[in-house]
A protein has these predicted regions:
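Conserved HGGG/HGGXW glycine-rich cap/lid loop of the alpha/beta-hydrolase fold
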Residues: 28-66, 85
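Glycine-rich His-Gly loop
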Residues: 32-35, 90, 112, 198
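Active-site loop/oxyanion-hole signature of alpha/beta-hydrolase fold enzymes
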Residues: 55-85, 121-126
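Gly/Ala-rich beta-loop-alpha elbow adjacent to hydrolase catalytic centers
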Residues: 88-92, 96
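Flexible "cap/lid" loop of the alpha/beta hydrolase fold
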Residues: 103-148, 175-179, 184, 204-205, ...
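Catalytic His-Asp charge-relay segment
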Residues: 191-197
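Conserved loop-alpha-helix segment in the C-terminal half of the alpha/beta-hydrolase fold
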Residues: 198-230, 243
Length: 248
């Protein structure tokens, strides 16, 4: 594995003994994080899946644009034999939509943006503004950041104080270009997809969620906020493990 490629994969080498991309054959699960956060936000889900013997890769984004983020995930997917299960949370849905994956794989949109042709994150968000808009700001470099007194209430109100505090440590800035670009392709048109709706999601407007969810082959609703990967990692693990088993 090249040094450049190893940077595409999140903290799995540190947390899981350097087993990055050692697998060949079978079904792998690729996890893609949301805006202004790091891949470590998936730690609870990744640990749960690996505890069940699943093959998991967490990809770090923040490459400067949506196209670069998509290329980083594509590089990892290309090293894994299809079928793969690719799960994108929040902004991660923009990324997984642009992947070149075949009909034997599966896309899971976890409270995520699910764009059609020509739709950027900014365009989707402005169509039906949700609570996330109240958190968006820019830093001195002009990059997007999430902050404000309502951050916990909007992003993860259904987690404990320790989990919320840990999640805040994973926040970082992200290049605005990531939100201006549309995906290079729309993978869900040929690859089976599942959309997970959080009934108490305050980050995305429900009208937008319903519009995007209607594009998926399967829709599941959970009684969660925008961040079930933190509040109900057990549900996410069960869903991805079942999807993985269905493709094996």
């Amino acid at each position: 594995m090249s040094r450049r490629l190893s940077r595409n994969v999140s903290h799995l080498g540190r947390h899981y003994g350097g087993r990055n991309l050692q697998y060949r054959g079978g079904v792998s699960i690729v996890l893609v994080h949301g805006r202004c956060l790091t891949g470590a936000v998936w730690d609870l889900v990744a640990e749960g899946l690996r505890g069940r013997g699943r093959r998991v890769e967490v990809v770090e984004l923040h490459r400067g644009s949506l196209l670069a983020d998509t290329a980083a995930v594509q590089e990892v997917v290309d090293l894994l034999e299809e079928p793969v299960v690719v799960c994108g949370w929040s902004y991660g849905g923009m990324v997984i939509t642009g992947l070149a994956v075949g009909p034997s794989s599966h896309l899971v949109y976890l409270c995520a943006l699910m764009p059609a042709e020509g739709e950027s994150a900014i365009e989707l968000g402005s169509r039906h503004p949700g609570g996330l808009a109240a958190l968006v700001d820019t830093d001195e470099a002009g990059d997007l950041v999430l902050r404000g007194d309502q951050l916990d209430e909007i992003l993860w109100p259904d987690v404990g104080s320790e989990t919320a505090a840990a999640a805040r440590t994973k926040l970082r800035s992200q290049a605005m270009q990531s939100f201006r670009e549309a995906p290079p392709r729309v993978a869900w048109r040929q690859t089976p997809s599942t959309y997970v709706v959080g009934r108490r999601d305050r980050a995305f407007h429900r009208h937008l969620v319903d519009e995007m969810a209607s594009r998926a082959a399967t829709v599941i609703e959970w009684d969660t906020s925008h961040s079930p990967l933190l509040s109900r990692p057990d549900l996410v693990v069960d869903l991805l493990a079942r999807t993985d088993a269905g493709l094996a």
